[in-house]
């Protein structure tokens, strides 16, 4: 709600959606820019999420991601907490993997 009110105050015509990054309700090549700030990294199925990101951004469009890295402070916290928590569901990727450039390149392939 805060973002909506800030956009309206600035006269920006922005539409905000909340949905499932693994199954976005948008057409192919619909956006010039697709961005995720600490969002897509929590999708359990990294391949499905990356496929959707690549599908909805137009050819030549931009994809911007902000994600935690495995080597930073949050990565250290994940390692520590991981010793005391049950493992993630089978097949679920670590959110920290999105902070690894090689992983993201592999997910997106030639996209």
Residue ranges and their predicted role:
Residues 38-41:
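Short catalytic micro-motifs in class I SAM-dependent methyltransferases
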Residues 34-35:
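Hydrophobic beta-strand segment of the Class I
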Residues 10-27:
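Conserved SAM-binding strand-loop segment of SAM-dependent methyltransferases
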Residues 47-48, 54-111:
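Conserved catalytic/acceptor-binding region of the Class I
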Residues 1-2:
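Short, small-residue-biased leader/transition segments that mark boundaries at the very start
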Residues 25, 44, 73:
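Glycine/Thr-rich phosphate-binding loops of Rossmann-like dinucleotide-binding domains
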């Amino acid at each position: 709600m805060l973002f909506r009110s800030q956009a309206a105050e600035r006269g920006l015509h922005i539409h905000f959606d909340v949905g499932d990054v693994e199954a976005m309700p948008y057409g192919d090549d619909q956006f010039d820019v697709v961005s995720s700030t600490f969002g897509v990294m929590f999708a359990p199925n990294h391949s499905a999420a990356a496929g959707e990101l690549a599908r909805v951004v137009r050819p030549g469009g931009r994809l911007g991601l902000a994600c935690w890295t495995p080597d930073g402070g949050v990565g250290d916290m994940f390692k520590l907490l991981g010793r005391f928590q049950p493992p993630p569901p089978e097949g679920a990727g670590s959110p920290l993997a999105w902070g690894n450039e090689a992983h993201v390149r592999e997910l997106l392939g030639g996209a």
